[in-house]
Amino acid sequence: MSKKIVTLAGDGIGPEIMSAGLSVLKAVSKKIDFEYELEAKDFGGIAIDKHGHPLPEETLQAVKNADAILLAAIGHPKYNNAKVRPEQGLLALRKELGLYANVRPLKIYPALKKLSPIRNVENVDFLVIRELTGGIYFGQHELADDKARDVNDYSADEIRRILHFAFKSAQSRPRKLLTSVDKQNVLATSKLWRKMADEIADEYPDVRLEHQLVDSCAMLLITNPQQFDVIVTENLFGDILSDEASSLAGSLGVMPSSSHGFNGLALYEPIHGSAPDIAGKGIANPVSMILSIAMMLRESFGQEDGAAMIEKAVTQTFTDGILTKDLGGTATTKEMTEAILKNCQ
């Protein structure tokens, strides 16, 4: 049965890397007999220009009826002081789809080790899972001249939902290790978080659960990143730790992500921005988009062979020394994509 994939190319380099990613999806799908149909919709800045809103109703209805969503990039400096901004569309999309679990995989490729800001990056391969719908970002906010207050609020249901997602993610990986990150020595929300993690762990006897305080975890991501397999944490901590972890890769151009909703629908996107300064020049790194498509094949459609094929092709392309400018090479978007296509075996 054919799967429906809605594509949101967005702004800046978005259309270029989306095109590159879809060419890889097309080639790999033929090899694994995966059938799909694409529906392209306006989103972000281009949607503001054409429809007056970053998330038009037509786009919203399309994504709600999709089996998966691919987003390339949104944003442009011209909207920085505008009343309506592209980023508002992404926040609205997350809310409408109930996207509660953000997943960022970090893998250090041997050929790219020299790009990492730290030396000790051998065999680094882990996930950071961040809760997206609760916590201090969504609590009550008060600001006065001499006082301010932000409320960190989590329900048991919100914590339970993300922890089950994380345990299942750890269960699917060879090491089966889950590190739950909190600040339970200070925060009430973290005390509840840790209590629930220990209780839920009984349902996953094959997964080893460890606890880390957030400050300790931040240090260990630099001093011993190999110890991690799957990290799960609340919204604010996850925002900070996932960005810290991403820096280990040396370039955002190789970092994919996924965000999963209540009903199983997921959004896949690179973690980098729209890079308007290089848009249209044909030099954007398409790898994060291509790897996001690999995540889609695995997480939404169970196509492990297709996902592994893409990931191995990317690894081989790096090993062959074909690198875009952000990785220290000279390859164009087209050349990088063609090399990955060639290595899809």
From Swiss-Prot:
Protein source organism: Lactococcus lactis subsp. lactis (strain IL1403) (Streptococcus lactis)
Protein name: 3-isopropylmalate dehydrogenase
Cofactor(s) needed for function: Mg(2+); Mn(2+)
Cellular component terms per the entry's GO annotation: cytosol
Annotated NAD(+) binding sites: 273-285
Family of this protein: Belongs to the isocitrate and isopropylmalate dehydrogenases family. LeuB type 1 subfamily.
Location(s), subcellular: Cytoplasm
Highest taxon of the lineage: Bacteria
Spans through the membrane: none
GO molecular function term, any single one: magnesium ion binding
